[in-house]
């Protein structure tokens, strides 16, 4: 490994932002881009009708609703680091896409609403992070509004997310009484200054806990601050980088993203603490980012990022080696050598051609239907990276076409949208139905809107008698033949040709499990 390679890997930080809906994640994403110099002025998700929409919410449906539906990938620089930021869907109906994004990052930033504490979606996402021991930094947001006491929020995080908190900044007051944050490491008070028209404002800084200026600025709140800091010093968790990197302890920052407050301190610390690109497990071995041969894995496919070009982009995480424009690599699933000629990097929907990229970088490659989620590309060695699954959907709909003459467009649209992984497509063994399965019901609405907008297909849904899906596996051909014969009307193939049992109710599933003990009923399926 040469020095350039090591230097490029070591300065990269690839992370995802996760939160419950409305905790302020997309706003914080904007502010990270603002402080990183990638944008000059932040738009706010709140004023959706204004000309400036949040940079990362670029799809029309996201701008209409003010929620993040797809995953945006953005690159910027800060303090000598190359940062790859993945803004994940915050809405509970998009957790499967969020999960796959978390397989492409080395760390995560968790955003918590100070008024609400830990919420349901946060629990699900933290389960995913725990599975991979992902290091987490926490930003407790909306201190400019009344909320829970910071000790209460941290206790909620520790008890419900099973991770210890180590505050690195500490808030003084909240809501109308919010005065700023104390930086525990530097011994400085950062006075709160509301943002001015989305631009960065620099507030007053007071040095030292015993500085008379502190009492002058805070009044009685200075006494409370000293008491709380003494309590933290005695009973709090000291920061331990090793425990952070193991996913056991989270450094905590407080602020107000909409006011650009507390963001710079968090970002400065984050890039110093967060891990550089990590080794990636493959079926045959673990691949180090410092290896010289190129390898990468596709974790997401987005159709029609530019409606004018009818394009699909495959998002690839580089795992090892160096990418150079036009390089020839092996696409292992189809066994072909391909040239990566037109790779791009992203700033939401803005794309820039990329001449070179390194481990940890996310590049987009044009996909004309040959690339799928989970595909591995490498220079020589046949590799298959693991850990990118499908989850069994919980909601199902039958797709009905209003205009029978558009059957081909419907099929093409459903297949392409299913390739993105946001919805799963099933074709029953009996009949010609299209059954869609999703983790959350809002995804069905998204699919119908995108079919109309991007494929000019008017479709609607009918309910169907399906409550759950399980992928089937057995090493006993006789068991499989018997099962297929007995449950034929309840079986379907998914988009990748894997057999699934679509159970009409939980009791029917229980009965099938009891009747066929040699059959595995799987709730996840590794993307092949």
Swiss-Prot record:
Q: Which domain of life is it from?
A: Bacteria
Q: Which UniProt keywords apply?
A: Cytoplasm, GTP-binding, Nucleotide-binding, Protein biosynthesis
Is Lyase among this UniProt entry's keywords?
A: no
What the entry lists under InterPro entries is as follows: EF-G-like_DII (IPR053905), EFG_III/V (IPR035647), G_TR_CS (IPR031157), P-loop_NTPase (IPR027417), PrfC (IPR004548), RF3_C (IPR032090), RF3_dom_3_sf (IPR038467), RF3_GTP-bd (IPR041732)
Read off the NCBIfam families from this record: prfC, PRK00741.1, small_GTP
What does the protein in this record do?
Increases the formation of ribosomal termination complexes and stimulates activities of RF-1 and RF-2. It binds guanine nucleotides and has strong preference for UGA stop codons. It may interact directly with the ribosome. The stimulation of RF-1 and RF-2 is significantly reduced by GTP and GDP, but not by GMP.
Full protein name: Peptide chain release factor 3
Organism encoding this protein = Oleidesulfovibrio alaskensis (strain ATCC BAA-1058 / DSM 17464 / G20) (Desulfovibrio alaskensis)
Gene that this sequence comes from: prfC
